[in-house]
Amino acid sequence: AALKQVDVAEYNPMECVKTNIGGAENVVKAAMETNVLKVIALSTDKASDPINLYGATKLTSDKIFISSNNIVGGKRDLRFSVVRYGNVVGSRGSVVPIFKSLIDQGKKELPITDVKMTRFWITLKQSVEFVLKSFERMKGGEIFVPKIPSIRIVDLAKAMAPKLNHKIVGMRPGE
């Protein structure tokens, strides 16, 4: 589990650190105390050159997982790797269900943070398949990144509701 919404992380920094970094430590400890052989941490594209607290905590989490390969050493076959991908289409808190809800409510316009704002997208099925393939390929210490498309939020809004207007609302904290 992770605290994954950028603006929520900015307003609740201690909870974000506790959840994302403390959670990573807990998973590593649990794996070391059991007979688990492989652990893949699910991360985010925002962990690469982070510009917000969410990305920074996920980068730290990634480093905890990767460095845990050194802690285990040759003591056992436990290996840690990371998968970083973008937004899962339709996931909780992402823009697709937000836009869908506004459209279903009969709203006349969709909020757009910035016309230049983009997101990387992956379907749930694609993300699961990529993680499973990463398990097969992992040796320990890798950061796997799928090649996935990006789309401007304004283009997504146009595709979902071509007749609705857009209202530029500005970037949220951390964006």
Where are these predicted regions, by residue range?
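SDR active-site strand-loop-helix element
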Residues: 1, 39-44, 83-85
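Conserved catalytic-site region of short-chain dehydrogenase/reductase
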Residues: 33, 45-50, 88-90
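NAD(P)-dependent short-chain dehydrogenase/reductase
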Residues: 53-54, 59-138, 149-153, 157-163
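A short helix->loop->beta-strand "cap" motif at the edges of active sites that frequently abuts
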Residues: 34-38, 76-78
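Terminal hydrophobic/aromatic helix or amphipathic segment near a protein terminus
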Residues: 164-175
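NAD(P)H-binding glycine-rich loop region in Rossmannoid oxidoreductase-like domains
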Residues: 1-18
